């Protein structure tokens, strides 16, 4: 568990590309309430800090657009967004409450191939972002996290930088063209939860 000061520090330093794997319950439609950030209000959600699990880190590649509000990454309410599938896949699992971030910070790009192409031309940029990721883990006060990568590109970066240091799992990216039920089954199978 993290304390309030640590939560606020994480929110202040990393809130525009990080979040936590906690969402409001869905409503009548699967995407309902996925963008409801009131779940991160410590005053109204008094059990929030007990739900957070910084020992598990879910890692995407990079933001696809600017994040306007702290902790809004992975909580996109737009109709075309697929973040709701993460909520469905992790609900009532040991991965609910995990820390969520991107390995590449502040690089807005929707096409992962363009991101990976850029990294091939600028290794120092990747190194800088890996340093920031290490700083995030330090601020989370976690020495040996379980790391879960969303998709092959995030996994490739994590694997080449941390393969001898941490256990890294690769799950399909949530934007893949698959239904939420199938996505949950794939994630459950890889992460071995019921």
Placement of each model-derived feature along the sequence:
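A polyanion-binding, active-site-adjacent surface
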Residues: 2-146, 156, 169
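Hydrophobic/aromatic-lined pockets within catalytic cores
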Residues: 91, 159, 176
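Short, flexible loop segments at boundaries between secondary-structure elements
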Residues: 164-194
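Short Gly/Pro-enriched loop/turn and capping motifs at secondary-structure junctions
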Residues: 105-106, 152-156, 174-177
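Short loop/helix-cap segments at secondary-structure boundaries that form the rim of catalytic
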Residues: 157-164
């Amino acid at each position: 568990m993290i304390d309030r000061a640590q939560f606020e520090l994480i929110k202040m330093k990393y809130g525009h590309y990080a979040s936590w794997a906690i969402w409001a319950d869905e409503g009548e439609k699967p995407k309902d309430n996925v963008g409801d950030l009131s779940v991160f209000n410590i005053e109204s959600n008094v059990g929030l800090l007990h739900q957070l699990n910084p020992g598990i880190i879910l890692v995407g590649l990079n933001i696809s657009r600017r994040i306007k509000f702290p902790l809004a990454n992975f909580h996109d309410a737009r109709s075309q967004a697929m973040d709701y599938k993460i909520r469905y896949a992790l609900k009532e699992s040991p991965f609910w409450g995990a820390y969520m971030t991107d390995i590449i910070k502040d690089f807005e790009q929707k096409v992962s191939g363009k991101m990976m192409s850029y990294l091939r031309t600028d290794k120092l940029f990747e190194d800088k972002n890996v340093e920031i990721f290490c700083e995030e883990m330090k601020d989370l006060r976690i020495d040996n996290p379980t790391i879960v990568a969303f998709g092959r590109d995030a996994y490739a970066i994590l694997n080449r930088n941390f393969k001898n240091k941490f256990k890294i799992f690769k799950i399909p990216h949530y934007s893949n063209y698959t239904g939420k039920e199938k996505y949950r089954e794939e994630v459950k199978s890889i992460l071995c939860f019921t």
